[in-house]
Curated annotation (Swiss-Prot):
Keyword Nucleotide-binding assigned: yes
InterPro entries: aa-tRNA-synt_IIb, aa-tRNA-synth_II, aa-tRNA-synth_II/BPL/LPL, Ser-tRNA-ligase_type_1, Ser-tRNA-synth_1_N, SerRS_1_N_sf, SerRS_core, tRNA-bd_arm
UniProt name for this protein: Serine--tRNA ligase
Lineage, uppermost ranks: Bacteria, Pseudomonadati, Pseudomonadota, Alphaproteobacteria, Sphingomonadales
Catalytic activity annotation: tRNA(Ser) + L-serine + ATP = L-seryl-tRNA(Ser) + AMP + diphosphate + H(+); tRNA(Sec) + L-serine + ATP = L-seryl-tRNA(Sec) + AMP + diphosphate + H(+)
Similarity section: Belongs to the class-II aminoacyl-tRNA synthetase family. Type-1 seryl-tRNA synthetase subfamily.
Annotated GO MF terms: ATP binding; serine-tRNA ligase activity
Pfam families membership: Seryl_tRNA_N, tRNA-synt_2b
Biochemical pathway: Aminoacyl-tRNA biosynthesis; selenocysteinyl-tRNA(Sec) biosynthesis; L-seryl-tRNA(Sec) from L-serine and tRNA(Sec): step 1/1
Binding of ATP, residues: 261-263, 348-351
Length: 426
């Protein structure tokens, strides 16, 4: 949600910032609503003050025996009592319209975000690792996985397209990856482990920006709750409506949860394999910070995600998203794209975003600086640390052997109960 005060102070700058994201100009329409709402609010105050004044004057007139004046004042008070509810209703409607307008447009991009229309305009920042030189033609995970326990047919039989059934050694590897990620993020990177709800209310999904614009991408239950598309929703909303102390910041949280997405906008994309699923697991990272700390926290969070890929020995590249490819709530986003030799391409495995105070305004999440009387909105950040299923895909493709087996990365061996290789016989 945007700050109406900033729009009042510099409408041109607001329109220019949104224009970088292909939106606008919208400032004048928002300010028109704001002006009318403020006029009505002022009139309400005037009516309330005059009603109180006239009510007192009635008693004074009656005390003097001036019945004519008293009756005139009574008539005026009666008229004001009729006018006031109408003004209150108009003010309520205008406030709702203004808030809807402030919530309808995406976050304004940071100054160093490159302009562009789509992913083709993203800017590569760095690369890590050298893709393995295979002595054979590497397979895609969709071809390699079924013999190792990645069962697409059973998943489709039970639940339909974009569901997968993991069995035996494959399920063990998936669990090992998730546990390793959690251990690294909590033990070395200082994130507090959480187990949040998977079902959330409208207010929570609005707070993190999925509602109202992206409802079709979500699953809704019959009682009106939503299955989380990411633990970002639950973790970020943990500070909804709160005023935190400065000493509580930064607040760093992590959670391993199932995530549920309808993939309404992904028809025809990644229909084979384990890349794009309706249900998948992810280790999410969320940070709540002071405004002046969010940029450095963004770099730190991204490094925490990169550390998982480095520990697993998976080549990847870091990409700065352009204005046309960023998510709705982000002011700056880094994507980490892992090398998949079977596809011969880098594919997204983590997205780390600084949302500034955009989500905090929607959630009314604040903090009180030490020694200050007033409060300020916090800044919120989120990132994948990592998507477990896509990391599984990357391990399968990068560690595959010519005989169809897959070597287990060294850092995962303590989690595998002595299993050092996935084999078709296993």
């Amino acid at each position: 949600m945007h700050d109406i005060r900033l729009i009042r102070e510099n409408a041109e700058a607001f329109d220019a910032a949104l224009a970088r994201r292909g939106v606008g100009p919208v400032a004048q329409s928002i300010l028109s609503l704001d002006s009318r709402r403020r006029e009505i609010a002022t009139r309400m105050q005037e009516v309330q003050a005059r009603r109180n004044e006239a009510s007192k004057a009635i008693g004074a007139a009656m005390g003097k025996g001036d019945k004519d004046t008293a009756e005139a004042l009574k008539a005026e008070v009666a008229a004001l009592k009729v006018e006031l509810p109408a003004l209150e209703e108009e003010e309520r409607q205008l406030t709702a319209q203004q808030n809807a307008a402030l919530a309808a447009y995406p976050n304004t991009p940071a100054a160093d975000v490159p302009e562009g229309a789509d992913e083709a305009d993203n800017v590569e920042v760095s690369r890590w690792g050298t893709p393995r030189d295979f002595a054979f033609a590497p397979k895609e995970h969709a071809d390699l996985g079924p013999a190792l326990g990645l069962d697409f047919e059973t998943g489709a039989l039970i639940s339909g397209a974009r569901f997968t059934f993991l069995k035996g050694q494959m399920a063990r590897l998936h669990r090992a990856l998730a546990q390793f990620m959690l251990d690294r993020q909590t033990g070395e990177n200082g994130y507090m482990e959480c187990i949040p709800p998977l079902l959330v209310k409208d207010e929570a999904v609005f707070g993190t920006g999925q509602l109202p614009k992206f409802a079709e991408d979500l699953f809704r239950t019959t009682d009106g709750r939503w299955l989380i598309p990411t633990a970002e929703v639950s973790l970020t909303n943990a500070v909804q409506g709160q005023i935190l102390g400065e000493a509580q910041l930064p607040l760093r949280m992590t959670a391993l949860t199932p995530c549920f997405r309808s993939e309404a906008g992904a028809a025809g994309r990644d229909t084979r394999g384990f890349i794009r699923q309706h249900q998948f697991e992810k280790v999410e990272l969320v940070s709540i910070t002071r405004p002046e700390d969010s940029e450095s926290e963004h770099e730190r969070m991204t490094q925490c995600a990169e550390g998982i890929l480095q520990a697993l020995g998976l080549p990847y590249r870091k990409v700065l998203l352009c204005t046309g490819d960023m998510g709705f709530t982000a002011r700056k986003t880094y994507d980490l794209e892992v090398w998949l030799p079977g596809q011969g391409a880098y594919r997204e495995i983590s997205s780390c975003s600084n949302c500034g105070d955009f989500q905090a305004r929607r959630m009314n999440a604040r903090y009180r600086p030490e020694g200050a009387k007033g409060t300020e909105f916090v800044h919120t950040l989120n990132g994948s640390g990592l998507a477990v299923g896509r990391t599984l895909v990357a391990v399968l493709e990068n560690y595959q052997q010519e005989d169809g087996s897959v070597a287990v990365p060294e850092v995962l061996l303590p989690y595998m109960g002595g299993l050092a290789r996935l084999t078709p016989q296993g």
